[in-house]
Amino acid sequence: MKSNFSKFKDFIKYKKVAVVGIGVSNRPLIKFLVKLGAKVTAFDKKHREKLGSISLELEEIGVDLVLGENYLDKLDGYDVIFKTPSMRIDRPEFVKAKESGAYITSEMEEFIKYCPAKVFGITGSDGKTTTTTLVYEMLKKEGYRTWVGGNIGTPLFANIEEMKEDHMVVLELSSFQLMTMDVSPEISLITNLSPNHLDVHKDFEEYVWAKKNIFKYQSSNNLLVLNKDDDLTNGMENEALGDVLKFSLVEKVYNGAYLSNNKLTMQGKEVCDSKDIKLKGRHNIANLLAAFCMVNKYVSIDSMKYVATNFSGVEHRCEFIREVNGVKYYNDSIASSPSRTLAGLNSFERPVILIAGGYDKKIPFKPLAEGGYDKIKILILMGDTKNKIKSAFEKVISHKKCEIEIVIVNSMEEAVKVADNMAEKGDIITLSPACASFDMYPNFEIRGNEFKNIVNSL
């Protein structure tokens, strides 16, 4: 049972509230808490000069600022602390604050707890953003007032009073956001699971445990959607508290969605033919099947079909940029894990020139090398992980007695220049890093946009 938002308003009024992080996503939260009558202090590692005009803007509405290297040392004495998702709750500063009586939470936890609309939550290692967008588009096509947020879209908590019971909310949720959750969306999906974010999580087991929070607190009338082709997610059916639907690319699933004879089918009803889908790759067929399961109770087959046959993809996901001298360029900057890069490679019909490498999330690259060696013509590596990826491929090349030319570069501009010089007519060049961007870029969007700008200047 959802809690009425008036309870939160009564609870937060006059409270001393700390918000950790003054990034773009937290700014609406800070302003909203001030509007609700809280006494807000915002914390950030950046100094005033780096934050720019937002520091003055927040101070003008009565927000106190704690900035600089040791900013978390001053978390004592607060009633409520909103932490940024990527910060572990077992940090000493949070542990100490909790022992002193602070209620530690996050924007997403409070949003799901109080949101009056029906909430669809999507998580997994790969396919989250595309599937979230597909679910959003299908609900919108059916005529629902639909909101999208979480890891994509805009922060939604500040808009919660505009939402009604007959609205729909679609959330992309990361393991960071889920790690401290004690509330679950009514309709939840885990797309697939493979090692990821092991720079933050203690191990893969903790990562999986965090993902499970998306359904751990559901009720008997809620829905969990699982990938039947993924052993880990398929096995979670026994832990479900409500109904379960599954999707599969390899076998018929009568209580769910499946691909058979190139037809995408939902509970025995044909939705569309795979040849009519604009999205590239089998992984995107899986994303569509997952979306069908999520919206099945709320959306007609016609709306599913319309989106499946008209939606051409999300920016930075196997996005075609242009063709230059017979060479096609694709931007797959969202591919921040080996499994996502493998899915991208599998969507092409010939070996490609791959640009990869980036921030080290402490995950293995052996699966990428073993699964992708025959799909790569030339491998161009950059970033913190370049030598780690090179080593993984060299072992597979030696074992398989195959040939892949590997080139190490120091910048995106150099990577594109090398790829352009080495490419022949008919080749495909794709940026699909298999890593996060944080060693060189603030996020994958900026990385992808730089790649596109360089390609468009050729």
Curated annotation (Swiss-Prot):
One of its GO terms (cellular component) is cytoplasm. It catalyses: UDP-N-acetyl-alpha-D-muramoyl-L-alanine + D-glutamate + ATP = UDP-N-acetyl-alpha-D-muramoyl-L-alanyl-D-glutamate + ADP + phosphate + H(+). GO terms for biological process: cell division; cell wall organization; peptidoglycan biosynthetic process; regulation of cell shape. ATP binds at G124, S125, D126, G127, K128, T129, T130. Its EC number is 6.3.2.9. It holds the Pfam family MurD-like_N. Pathway: Cell wall biogenesis; peptidoglycan biosynthesis. It is found in: Cytoplasm. Gene3D superfamilies: Mur ligase, C-terminal domain, Mur-like, catalytic domain, NAD(P)-binding Rossmann-like Domain. GO terms for molecular function: ATP binding; UDP-N-acetylmuramoylalanine-D-glutamate ligase activity. Keywords: ATP-binding, Cell cycle, Cell division, Cell shape, Cell wall biogenesis/degradation, Cytoplasm, Ligase, Nucleotide-binding, Peptidoglycan synthesis. InterPro entries: Mur-like_cat_sf, Mur_ligase_C, Mur_ligase_C_dom_sf, Mur_ligase_cen, MurD. Belongs to the MurCDEF family. HAMAP family: MurD. Cell wall formation. Catalyzes the addition of glutamate to the nucleotide precursor UDP-N-acetylmuramoyl-L-alanine (UMA). This is UDP-N-acetylmuramoylalanine--D-glutamate ligase. It comes from Clostridium botulinum (strain 657 / Type Ba4).
